[in-house]
């Protein structure tokens, strides 16, 4: 069984006041811009971006990815597929689109690389439970 080790997704915040842009991530090279709850943590729609190229656009709840969203690792970052074996890979320019629950991948996801779907997966509590190749579109022949 394969596991997806998403780069640290849990977002811990200690921000004062409600604001649209939160910078406590600066020490980690990340910035959040979006809706904020009464507790000062991201809640609702927002964008989280890091200097190393990681980003998340989607829903947040209590400072964590929660709901529909897209997590992207640019050419500067890496996403690892485990366990490490001949099938393991460091994936760059990957986007994982789907549902998150309490900061972890949960539900159906499409993994794309450079805009092309690479595989479809089902996750449960951050663990990959099922992986399928995307269906190829029928080519037109004359």
Regions of interest found by a model, annotated:
Residues 14-142:
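Glycine/tyrosine- and acidic-biased, solvent-exposed loop/turn segments at the edges of beta-strands
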Residues 4-13:
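Sec-dependent N-terminal signal peptides
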């Amino acid at each position: 069984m394969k596991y997806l080790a998403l780069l640290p997704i849990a977002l811990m915040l200690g921000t004062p006041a409600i604001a649209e842009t939160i910078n406590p991530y600066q020490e980690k090279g990340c910035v959040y811009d979006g809706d904020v709850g009464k507790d000062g943590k991201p809640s609702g729609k927002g964008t989280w971006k890091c200097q190393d190229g990681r980003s998340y656009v989607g829903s947040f709840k209590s400072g964590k990815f929660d709901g529909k969203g897209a997590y992207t690792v640019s050419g500067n970052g890496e996403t690892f597929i485990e366990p490490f074996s001949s099938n393991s890979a460091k994936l760059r320019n990957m986007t994982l689109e789907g549902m998150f629950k309490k900061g972890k991948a949960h539900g159906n996801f499409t993994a794309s690389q450079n805009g092309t779907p690479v595989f479809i997966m089902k996750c449960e509590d951050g663990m990959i439970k099922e992986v399928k190749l995307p269906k190829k579109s029928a080519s037109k022949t004359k």
